[in-house]
Design a protein with these regions (language model features):
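Catalytic pocket-lining loop regions of alpha/beta-barrel enzymes
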Residues: 106-107, 120-232
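Short, acidic/polar
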Residues: 35-46, 89-100, 182
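Acidic/histidine-rich helix-loop elements
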Residues: 21-38, 147, 207
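Divalent metal-dependent hydrolysis catalytic cores, especially in the metallo-beta-lactamase
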Residues: 20, 32-36, 40-62, 79-84, ...
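Active-site gating/metal-coordination segments in enzymes
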Residues: 62-155
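Conserved, mostly hydrophobic/aromatic
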Residues: 19, 47, 68, 108, ...
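Histidine-centered divalent metal-coordination motifs
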Residues: 14, 19-25, 141, 176
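Mid-to-C-terminal alpha-helical segments outside catalytic/metal-binding sites
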Residues: 1-14, 18, 31-54, 225-230, ...
């Protein structure tokens, strides 16, 4: 059972869940979808229960940018929308521009693993150019997905290394800590000032006590590499609700067997707000 060892105190900056959806679609078989939808009221109630002020809502392969934009308009003080394109397709650069200028979406979510391209494919560069020009952060789904059409080879941190080098002004967020290539992902964040990571649902059973241990271990690696301040909070809502994930962070040091192995809680809490706002990852 998770018990809070640290109190979530009032802070000056809005706390943000940087990785949310309005449907569970990422893991669904397109031919046999299993979709759980949430209403605006349910979403806001869950945010309040978790002590979170705002949420980044992501488009994906079957939740359109228009759907996300319309949902965000219901509570613009709470919701920040991200669009979606397949960047190797013709016209995806124009679509990116429209999603920002016409739909009002702030960033993009890309799925190289399931859309079948490498992030460093030069055909995708036209989208990176537009996103960089418009100051649109790009979040990459940077982990495996347990579906037949997913290819782990397209979530290699070495590919992001190339993109970050070619587009130094492009803000890149690597979702799920790059699991299972966590250490390599953190190293890319260390190498490039424009690369960040979120901690959304990177492992199997989020309700198992070992989940806290795995996240603690990876955040300790981030601390050692000097990139803990480039890690941002995210849940993968509605798959994971905000309250239990925040509770887990409050108890993140439960497996630290020595004071030297404890994560500094003020910097852990920065993942919810300061790390997001100070790097311009939200408006």
């Amino acid at each position: 059972m998770i018990t809070r060892q640290y109190t979530l105190k009032a802070r000056s900056l809005p706390k943000v869940d940087y990785h949310c959806h309005i449907n569970i679609t990422e893991y669904s078989d397109p031919a046999n979808p299993t979709v759980i939808s949430v209403s605006k009221e349910e979403f806001i109630a869950d945010l309040k229960e978790g002590g979170i002020d705002k949420a980044v809502i992501l488009s994906d392969r079957r939740t359109t940018p228009k759907q996300v934009a319309d949902f965000c308009k219901q509570a613009p003080e709470r919701f920040i929308g991200f669009g979606y394109v397949n960047p190797i397709l013709i016209g995806s650069d124009e679509d990116t521009r429209k999603q920002r200028e016409e739909l009002g979406l702030y960033g993009l979510k890309l799925y190289p693993c399931s859309d079948g391209y490498s992030p460093d494919d030069t055909h995708a560069f036209k989208v990176y150019e537009v996103a960089s020009e418009l100051d649109m952060p790009i979040m990459f789904h940077h982990a495996g997905m347990p579906v037949p059409y997913d290819y782990l080879k397209n979530t290699n941190p070495a590919q992001i290394d190339v993109v970050a080098q070619c587009f130094p002004e492009l803000k890149i967020v690597l979702a799920h800590l790059g699991y299972p290539r966590v250490d390599e992902t953190l190293y890319v964040a260390r190498k490039h000032r424009n690369v960040f990571c979120d901690i959304s649902w990177p492992y199997g059973d989020v309700n198992h006590p070992s989940f806290v241990y795995l996240l603690w271990k990876d955040l300790l690696t981030a601390l050692n590499m000097g990139v803990l301040d480039k890690i941002v909070f995210g849940t993968d809502y509605p798959g994971v609700r905000q309250r239990p994930y925040v509770d887990m962070l409050m108890d993140i040091n439960r497996y630290a067997t020595h004071d030297d192995l404890k994560l500094p809680m003020d910097r852990v809490m920065n993942m919810l707000d300061k790390n997001i706002h100070s790097h311009g990852l939200v408006p």
